[in-house]
Amino acid sequence: GMQHKYNETVLFFPSQGQTCHAYCTFCFRWPQFVGMDEMKFAMKEGEALSQYVTEHPEVSDILFTGGDPMIMKASLFGAYIDKLLDADVPNLKTIRIGTKALSYWPYKVLTDKDAEETLDTFRRITDKGIHLSIMAHFNHLVEMKTGSVKAAIKKMRETGAQIRTQSPLLTHINDDANMWAQMWQKQVELGCVPYYMFVVRDTGAQHYFGVPLVRAHQIFKTAIEQVSGLARTVRGPSMSATPGKVQIDG
């Protein structure tokens, strides 16, 4: 289905992308993975999406999310994209794809049978003059150190896509300012753009991972002071809430 939460951005939940590479208990879309069908977003056809964007000229961005749209076969994902591209919507400027594929299955664009087809879909977007932003989810610096992740990032960037990173702040996993500083620096080194530090929302079985907001702000402040301006594109600590994104400034 669709969610028009922000004036300029429509969230799109393709029905075939409502599972994920991982089942994180801190995920704020936990209901989608535990059998609560009435809370799932689903849509079988892409026509409604292109029609909606056409009828709402204020919309410039579409975020493909889930679940994870990158668990879909390239042919299925490409069909959604082609519906949008064929509609030639003048107000559509950016397509975003929220995914954990880089950290959990970089082979999606390396060795999967349809890896090149996936990359071709990315190229069709950028060749159309539409900005493509891969919203890559990483939880820790170590996820960025493997050769396969580095190769996948390179492949994606060669299509003209830009990779922006977003990460949740998690007790027992990454609640360390030095790690965050190193992770942002590594992301810049690999050609990615640090984008968000998230705090976990009050959904699902996330209580084990939650970090108090005061400490979250301290971690962010200490980390941001250790990096150059190129990594200070990151925003946080942030939370997606009913009014939109809420950021703690102090």
What spans do the regions from the language model cover?
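Local cysteine-cluster metal-coordination motifs and their immediate loop/turn environment
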Residues: F13-P31
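Conserved AdoMet/S-adenosylmethionine-binding subsite of the radical SAM
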Residues: E47-T54, M70-F209, V214-R215, I219-V227
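N-terminal [4Fe-4S]-dependent radical SAM core
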Residues: G1-F12
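C-terminal accessory regions of radical SAM enzymes
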Residues: Q218-G250
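Residue-level recognition of the N-termini of beta-strands and the immediately preceding loop/turn
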Residues: S60-I62, L92-I95, I130-L132, T233-P237
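A short secondary-structure junction signal
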Residues: A22-F26, G35-M39, G147-S148
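Short glycine-rich or small-residue beta-strand-to-loop segments that form or flank ligand, phosphate
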Residues: L11-F13, L63-G66
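Conserved alpha-helical substructure of the radical SAM core
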Residues: T9, W30-I62, M72, L76-A79
